[in-house]
Amino acid sequence: ERVFLDTWVGRQSHGLFWRHYRIAGEDGAALLYAVSIWVIMDIESRALTKDHAWAVVSRVTVEGELPAAFKSIPFPRELAERSSRRVTDTETDGNGHLNNCLYLRWGQDLLPEEFARTHALRSVWIEYRKELPRGTESELTYSLSGSTLYVRGTAENKERFLLRMEYDETV
């Protein structure tokens, strides 16, 4: 089966940049639509960039475009399980921080083996609070409640991220 990916720059506001993604089948029907919101930094100065001209390549209007909205996601205050993890060299991005996609791996690594074999990931929600630099030891508190994994990552007494992963049973 062939699929097609379209991506385009959306609006920008207060240093935030929207990027839209659409995956469609050969018949043109949308299989997936997503919006990501980015904050762009200068790597050397670690400051938000002031020159945003690069982000506006062209404006494209797509009918039915989803609005990007910040919604509060229910997240438990207390999580019973504990683990820890150190950010390794191979887990870092160009800024020297834990690569964004690896938060998911950290979450998946906490799942019981039987659960991981019998469930498929349905949805992910991540709230990044503060970066995790190379070598940082992070305390992970977590809980598997039904088919939802909740993970809170802290380091140096600061909350760094919240992760919620929802699963569907496959067997």
Q: Where in this protein do the model-derived segments appear?
A:
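A short alpha-helix capping/helix-coil boundary motif
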Residues: 72, 82-83
